[in-house]
């Protein structure tokens, strides 16, 4: 049976994912050794976790697929947010480097605008936490310029950016 274990975990992860049990799906996906599907699940569900205040869970998931953060810009952005929300402020900028590299060589699309807005918002949050009002305002304004109203996660970040502008 040991040879069948990865396949059983893979099947369980698909079932859990299809039935809305994301945490269980990711746990089984990681146990199956399917890093690519784990990354996809994390990218697809990371924003919801952050909006529910589960930044620590998100950080644990991202650390389980650490090798992919360099090649997946959204994973890098989620990692930066997880660091910020868990108080690891000194690790936020380095987490954003892969996303910076990706976006600098990408065509402007809705996806890249959301990424740029998310990066500006986490930088605004970081500057605000450090008491740098000038940088917080600049990044918050930048975030508002990129983030669309029609995407739920982007709306949350727009609210954060607006709040930072009100605090500064």
Language-model segments: residues:
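Hydrophobic core segments within long, regular secondary-structure runs in both alpha-
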Residues: 6, 10-13, 39, 55-63, ...
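Tandem amphipathic alpha-helical repeat scaffolds
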Residues: 39-48, 74-89, 115-132, 156-168
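Amphipathic alpha-helical segments of tetratricopeptide repeats
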Residues: 26, 46-47, 59-63, 67, ...
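Extended alpha-helical scaffolding segments used for macromolecular assembly and cargo binding
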Residues: 2-76, 82
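Alpha-solenoid helical repeat architecture
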Residues: 21-23, 35-36, 71-74, 107-118, ...
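Short, glycine- and charge-enriched coil/turn segments that flank and shape catalytic ligand pockets
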Residues: 1-4, 104-110
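Residue-level detection of beta-strand scaffold positions
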Residues: 13, 29, 76-78, 92, ...
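Short alpha-helical linear motifs
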Residues: 51-54, 63-67, 82-86, 99-102, ...
């Amino acid at each position: 049976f040991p040879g069948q274990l990865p396949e059983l975990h893979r099947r369980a992860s698909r079932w859990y994912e299809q039935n809305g049990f994301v945490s269980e799906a990711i746990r089984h996906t990681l146990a199956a050794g399917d890093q690519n599907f784990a990354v996809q699940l994390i990218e697809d569900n990371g924003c919801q976790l952050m909006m529910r205040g589960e930044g620590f869970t998100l950080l644990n998931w991202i650390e389980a697929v650490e090798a992919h953060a360099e090649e997946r810009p959204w994973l890098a952005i989620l990692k930066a947010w997880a660091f910020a929300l868990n108080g690891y402020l000194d690790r936020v900028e380095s987490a954003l480097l892969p996303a910076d590299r990706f976006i600098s060589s990408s065509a402007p699309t809705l996806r890249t605008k959301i990424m740029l807005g998310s990066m500006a918002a986490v930088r605004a949050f970081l500057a605000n936490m450090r008491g740098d009002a000038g940088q917080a305002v600049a990044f918050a304004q930048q975030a508002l310029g990129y983030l669309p109203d029609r995407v739920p996660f982007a709306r949350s970040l727009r609210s954060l950016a607006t709040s930072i502008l009100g605090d500064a």
